[in-house]
């Protein structure tokens, strides 16, 4: 119940930030209108919805957020995703379903059999239990920095961000999970937004999106996605 009241309060606070009002950048307006607020029912939503019940006891986002991540991948078409903090595995599965050519590496400090079964025989998803720092460094030693990074269900978000930030490219999109989860994380999110090394950022409350195209004017977009 507390979460419902908190969301209602934040929805009111973000009321004027709905539907791209006041956004003058054509690319940002397109992203808000046709990715964030897109309502068309994608083909994969129904089978993915059926898989949710079996892993909802593990850390996860609302279904609305997982569908957003699906649309982000569908729009940007990244070739690779690195996810840190697998949680229920639902977000990785949604994003993998949006691009059949994208390879996914998802790292967690705990291995869950139900998550492994959720991924099933999908050869494009690699699910790895590891110390996160070691797993990230090993990944980067074998691969270029991926086009899409998801810092998800992990208490080590600061360390993960600091490890990956020097490796990002102008095409990289970084998804920050639950930037308002704690007072400490909220303050850190403000620092990420203000950091001169980051570019355009989007605050959707449940997730933050960070882009690194330095040819763009640095701006911060608050979007009412509650």
Give the residues covered by each predicted segment.
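A short alpha-helical cap/connector motif
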Residues: 1-150, 154-170, 180-226
């Amino acid at each position: 119940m507390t979460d419902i009241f908190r969301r209602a309060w934040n929805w009111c606070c973000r009321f004027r930030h709905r539907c791209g009002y006041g956004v003058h950048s054509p690319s940002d307006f397109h992203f808000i209108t046709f990715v964030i607020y897109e309502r068309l029912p994608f083909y994969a939503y129904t089978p993915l919805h059926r898989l949710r019940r079996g892993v909802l006891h593990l850390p996860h986002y609302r279904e609305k957020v997982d569908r957003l991540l699906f649309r982000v991948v569908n729009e940007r078409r990244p070739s690779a995703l690195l996810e840190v903090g697998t949680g229920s595995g639902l977000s990785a599965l949604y994003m993998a379903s949006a691009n059949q050519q994208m390879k996914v590496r998802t790292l967690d400090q705990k291995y869950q059999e139900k998550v492994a079964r959720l991924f099933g025989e999908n050869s494009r998803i690699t699910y790895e239990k590891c110390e996160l720092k070691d797993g990230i460094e090993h990944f980067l030693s074998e691969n270029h920095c991926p086009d899409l990074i998801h810092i998800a269900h992990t208490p080590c978000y600061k360390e993960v961000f600091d490890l990956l930030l020097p490796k990002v490219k102008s095409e990289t999109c970084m998804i920050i999970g639950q930037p308002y989860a704690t007072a400490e994380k909220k303050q850190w999110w403000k620092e990420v937004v203000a950091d001169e090394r980051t570019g355009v950022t989007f605050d959707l409350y449940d997730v933050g999106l960070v882009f690194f195209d330095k040819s763009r004017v640095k701006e911060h977009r608050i979007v009412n996605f509650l």
